[in-house]
Design a protein with these regions (language model features):
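Short amphipathic alpha-helical segments, especially helix-boundary/capping motifs
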Residues: 8-14, 64-68, 112-114, 135, ...
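Conserved Radical SAM active-site core
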Residues: 74-174
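Structural signal for hydrophobic packing residues in well-ordered secondary-structure cores
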Residues: 10, 26, 39-43, 69, ...
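Canonical Radical SAM [4Fe-4S] cluster-binding loop centered on the CxxxCxxC motif
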Residues: 47-86, 110
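Short, well-ordered coil loops that connect the C-terminus of an alpha-helix to the N-terminus
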Residues: 44-45, 63, 146, 169
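Flexible, acidic/Gly-rich N-terminal and inter-domain linker regions that tether
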Residues: 1-62
């Protein structure tokens, strides 16, 4: 697909087949130019943001990525997961300061690495971190004015579909399909 063909998308949407072919373009400069023009045409040059309260549901993770400054090992005399009352207290504080979203961040499936994580999840009534996240994000929708935004790491298509029912947006490292 050449630059002229990409420029065609300024006037029409690509077909599904064409959209797949766009991933093979080597001339990323042209692709970025067309994407920028389409963005500006549709939304102008306004930069917007939404105030978020940061909810680190757990800092434990199955992975050990040496660039990561978020993840850590279990700490003595500390919960591995934020407790429901801690989460709700933080959410209320966010509402008080005008936040619109609750940004949930967490390590990827720590229960697969740490016995302690599995035991804490069981005490919370869950087998998985994603199950606990689902319950907690659901409470945000029901009990606060905030909108849950989930950054939950690697998920299956089923996980994504399930969590979509309790979130306004999701970020993923990658999806396993």
């Amino acid at each position: 697909m050449n630059a002229l063909k990409v420029d065609d998308f300024l006037e029409r949407r690509p077909t599904e087949e064409e959209a797949h072919l766009l991933t093979e373009i080597r001339d990323t400069g042209t692709l970025f130019r067309v994407a920028s023009e389409l963005r500006d045409k549709g939304h102008g040059n306004i930069i917007s943001y939404s105030r978020k309260i940061f909810i680190p549901l757990t800092k434990l993770c199955i992975d050990v990525c040496h660039y990561c400054t978020f993840s850590r090992d279990p700490q003595k005399n500390q919960h591995s997961f934020m407790q429901p009352d801690e989460v709700m207290e933080l959410l209320r504080e966010g509402e008080k300061y005008g936040c619109k979203e609750a940004l949930f961040t967490l390590g990827d499936k720590p229960e697969l690495r740490y016995t302690r994580a599995r035991k804490e999840l069981q005490k919370l009534g869950h087998e998985t971190t994603l199950s606990y996240l689902f319950e907690t994000a659901g409470r945000v929708l029901k009990e606060t004015t905030l909108l849950p935004h989930l950054n939950a790491g690697v998920m299956t298509s089923e996980d994504l579909r399930n969590l979509r029912t309790v979130s306004v947006s999701q970020e993923i490292g990658r999806a396993h399909v």
